[in-house]
Amino acid sequence: MAAQQNFDTSLFKYILRYSWKAQIFIVIVTLVSLPFYYASLDVPKQIINKVLDTKHRDYLQSPKFFGVGLDLFQGDKIWLLVFFCFIFFCFVLINGGFKLYINVLKGKLGERMLRRLRYQLYDTILRFPLPHFRKTSEGELINMITAEVEPVGGFIGDAFVTPLYQGGLLLTAIFFIFMQDWSMGLASVALYPIQGYLIPKLQRKVRALGRDRVREMRKVSERIGDTVNLAREIRAHQTGDYERADYADRMGRVFDIRFKIYNLKFFVKFLNNFLTQMTPLMFFSFGGYLVIQGQLSLGALVAALAAQKDLLSPWNELLNNYQIQQDSQQKYEQVVTAFNIDGTLPMEKPIDRVEPLKGEIAARDATVTDEGVTLLERVSFGMQLTERVAVVGAGSSGKDVLAQMVAGLVRPSSGSLRIGGRDINELPPAVLGRRIAYVAADSGLMTGTVGDNLHYVLKHRPVKPADYDPGEAALRRSALAEAAIAGNATDDIRAGWIDYDVLGVKDEAGLKQATLTTLRMADTLDDVYQLGLRVTIDVKRQPELVARLMKARAAMRARLADAANATLVEPFDPAAFIMNASLAENMFFATAAAVAFDPDKLGENAYVLAVLQKTGLEDEFMQIGLGVLGNLLELAGDGGAGGALLADVSVVKLDELPDYKPLVDKAKRDGAKALDGEERAMILSVPFKLVPTRERHVEISDAFKARMLEARKAFAAGLPDKLKGSVEFFDPEKFNTQLTLRDNILFGKVALNQAQAAQHANAMMADVIAELELHDAIIEAGFGFQVGTRGSRLSAAQRQKLAVARATLKRPDLLVLAEATTALDSASDARVVDAVLKEFKDRGVLWAVQKASTARRFDRVIVMADGRVAEEGAFAELEKKEGSALSALLKAE
């Protein structure tokens, strides 16, 4: 594909292309402001010469017309002074108003253009050729869009108006000085040529160092991204010290560059300030001489000095603008060069309706290369869009590349691939994206809920406008209008984007049923059910479900009341100390709903400390905390078996344990009272996370339990109004919105000291849920489970099954999979394959399978070897064929 020149490499061309009208308007306003500035410079001179100078009469003479003039303010210089001061005040307001208005216009224009640039960069990422993502780290792209273009936005508003405005102020002030005396004017500009030559030259060196700094910081961003993505491997292989050394070395290089930049910048500032201060010296010496000689009035000298002082600001602004312009051009070039790459997809036009794909997929001598390496070589094959075809081969056979090529994710560098009689390069991205689905082993999930990820494939365009009240509608129209001005998308993200027509349903209920069917096909229905038990829900939004869950709680309590089950779960009893709950839960008898009761900082909470002191528990908590920490530090120093025991520690993070050692040593040496307030808070926070049945080495006496129950009553009784929304108390008759569905049904703590208590309790709860027909409702609640960054809160198998479900949900004409179920066990893998093939009985499936034996379930098999099609045909025929490539793969399993 031909190279796409997505951006002009000249920043000024980019600015003019998208903002020339706004720039012209700001320029006009700037030009209009200059006469008022000039007039303001003349007023101080008039005050000195016509009011304060005793040689002048006590009135102001107006200009004469036809020899007749009018004398103003006769007889009183005070009123004359008031008049001139009022005029000066008016000019101050006018000039300040112009400056405010121009600055607001500049700021708005700069922000609009920055928004446009960031949007265009993000849009370009969406159109990057997929192989390019292997060469560019996400850290680099994120840094370029968020940080590197930030200064560019600030400069865009200043690009034309600042040189014009500040240059206009400078020239106006210089012109005014020349009008007082030409020699003073020459003195005012005598040093500018020196500054104009030296300072830009030094700034060029600063820019060169700036480019080096940007390159180094991109590498640092890439390394940080690697650290985040490989955190598990770094921890598993204990290579943290190596990573720290590598990071320190990189930051050392950045430090050296930045220090050189600072040295040059401050030298430039020193040089500029030094040369600038020479001009007043020339004014005082030469101008004073002229006043003494009577060749210049005192008012003119004072006005010239005031004007010269006004020269400093615009001159410095011009120099600063020049530096910013050079920096911005440099940053802009570096960013857009990284985005002007070959193979970028063209911008597509919106398509409302996409016709189904029909006919045949035909590859003829298709070759795929990447960075000079041939991945597929002269591949030819054909399949009907009603066939189910397996692709088998070794790991490096090219079967995964073949799948990507058929899905339109990589394009043939030579040869052809036709789908439904049309070359794949001619098919719009909308056709490929809506009529073909692709799933790989590493298919990612978006940050969001399970439902967000499943329904993501149905969000091609807004299909239903959002419902707004009149006030919200006006605000939204204004926001979308601003987006249009900034060249951003104007589709309303709050509109209904889920296209029910794709599924052949009409409403939310139909969508839920279609989703449940798809989850069942992908063998992940039980996974989502289990996730549903782990979510919290909003009582106001789902009152019917809450009522049904409260019935489940009552049924669960009835079953647990049986003597055989009574010890499985310790209920939330207001009058009992709960051995399987933390000390914080025992004291509060509630769950925290705000950061005010952060479990890691309860020792700092003034109200909690007041309750401890009131009930005489503070010293006991301190001793428990010191004892627990002492045991942990002893285990940590033990290594071996001690290290294994530390893996179960929940009261303190292991990487923070060394921070407590000086505190424990100090308390042992000098007593707990020797600890200061911050140190006591750290120790007191530890016991709150202690669960008695888990940390069995901590003895919990009956007297301590009694005092904890007193503290529970005191905590609830004295809770300040401002903190009442920060906790939600355990109430047997009320649904707790801070607890998961599972914990709301159990409404207690599973016994940690009883073998298989959790399994028995879960089985009992499953029976209750089935009896009350809550299973599907909990699965629907599971749609709201947050999957984490890239699905990090899910297992690899769960991520793969959800990816398969997501792809099949959009009802594609062709489903392409590349080893999409590698994390599944054999039984689950077989169920998913069979269910998908059954669902796609009359549609196309191309599946690059991990095991060759899986291919026996498909209509046909394509065998890949070394990037070529080794053979193809029916599985049974190829299996029987002597010396076939398929039989060799089967023997290798």
Task: Enumerate the predicted regions with their spans.
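Membrane-integrated ABC transporters
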Residues: M1-S40, Q46-F88, I94, F98-K106, ...
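Transmembrane helices of ABC transporter permease
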Residues: Q23-L34, V161-D212, S285-L296
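C-terminal portion of ABC ATPase nucleotide-binding domains
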Residues: K50, L60-Q61, K358, K459-A509, ...
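Hydrophobic alpha-helical segments in the permease module
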Residues: F88-N95, Y192-Y197, K265-T279, S285, ...
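Loop segments that connect adjacent transmembrane helices in multi-pass transporters
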Residues: T136-G139, D212-K260, D327, Y332
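Cytosolic ends of transmembrane helices, especially the final helix of ABC transmembrane type-1 domains
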Residues: A236-T239, N263, D310-A338
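Primarily ABC-family ATPase nucleotide-binding module
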Residues: F339-E387, K838
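Helix-to-loop junction immediately C-terminal to a conserved catalytic motif
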Residues: A407
